[in-house]
Amino acid sequence: MADSIIQSPDLGDVTGYLRERIRTVPDWPQPGVMFRDITPLLQDPKTLRVLIDVFVHRYMDAQLDLVAGIDARGFILGAIVAYELNLGFVPIRKKGKLPFQTVAEEYELEYGSATVEIHADACKTGDRVLLVDDLIATGGTMMAGRKLLERLGATVVEGAAIVDLPELGGSKLLHGAGLPLFTVCKFEGH
């Protein structure tokens, strides 16, 4: 499946521009994995601006109330996008990291399970929320984040990420569950 092409008068193919700057680290964190490292996108100010502008232009008229970001790289992207859209930011954290009353959601990993949490007062009924992470692999983390927000009465308008790894099935899972999904680029393989 080809990437959707995002065009810019200054840069041309923005999708390609950003995709070329994502570093691939073979065999990390384990043999056979091709890790897609987004940190080069964050290190260069021009590239970071281009990345954030992609999300800001997509969501500037979406009538959102909040942006929620998933621990940890979703915090980086989500907080900047929230700031640029003049919205509040909600962190969805790994279990045991939030100091106030929380709501938790367990989800399955390839080997075992994990839990994410959100403050019980993080959003209110009717809030329209953009849910952000850096990458979609199996979709489990984003699905858990969506469930947390919906349990608090919010509507997740869309899930958004920089990278989709479609072979791992996450984007298919999320689409199948009725969650609209936007990603900047796709990479085949793990």
UniProtKB/Swiss-Prot annotation:
<dbReference type="GO" id="GO:0005737">
    <property type="term" value="C:cytoplasm"/>
</dbReference>
<keyword id="KW-0808">Transferase</keyword>
<keyword id="KW-0660">Purine salvage</keyword>
<dbReference type="Pfam" id="PF00156">
    <property type="entry name" value="Pribosyltran"/>
</dbReference>
<comment type="similarity">
    <text>Belongs to the purine/pyrimidine phosphoribosyltransferase family.</text>
</comment>
<dbReference type="GO" id="GO:0003999">
    <property type="term" value="F:adenine phosphoribosyltransferase activity"/>
</dbReference>
<comment type="subunit">
    <text>Homodimer.</text>
</comment>
<protein>
    <recommendedName>
        <fullName>Adenine phosphoribosyltransferase</fullName>
        <ecNumber>2.4.2.7</ecNumber>
    </recommendedName>
</protein>
<dbReference type="InterPro" id="IPR029057">
    <property type="entry name" value="PRTase-like"/>
</dbReference>
<comment type="pathway">
    <text>Purine metabolism; AMP biosynthesis via salvage pathway; AMP from adenine: step 1/1.</text>
</comment>
<dbReference type="GO" id="GO:0044209">
    <property type="term" value="P:AMP salvage"/>
</dbReference>
<dbReference type="InterPro" id="IPR005764">
    <property type="entry name" value="Ade_phspho_trans"/>
</dbReference>
<dbReference type="InterPro" id="IPR050120">
    <property type="entry name" value="Adenine_PRTase"/>
</dbReference>
<dbReference type="GO" id="GO:0006168">
    <property type="term" value="P:adenine salvage"/>
</dbReference>
<keyword id="KW-0328">Glycosyltransferase</keyword>
<comment type="function">
    <text>Catalyzes a salvage reaction resulting in the formation of AMP, that is energically less costly than de novo synthesis.</text>
</comment>
<dbReference type="GO" id="GO:0006166">
    <property type="term" value="P:purine ribonucleoside salvage"/>
</dbReference>
<keyword id="KW-0963">Cytoplasm</keyword>
<dbReference type="InterPro" id="IPR000836">
    <property type="entry name" value="PRibTrfase_dom"/>
</dbReference>
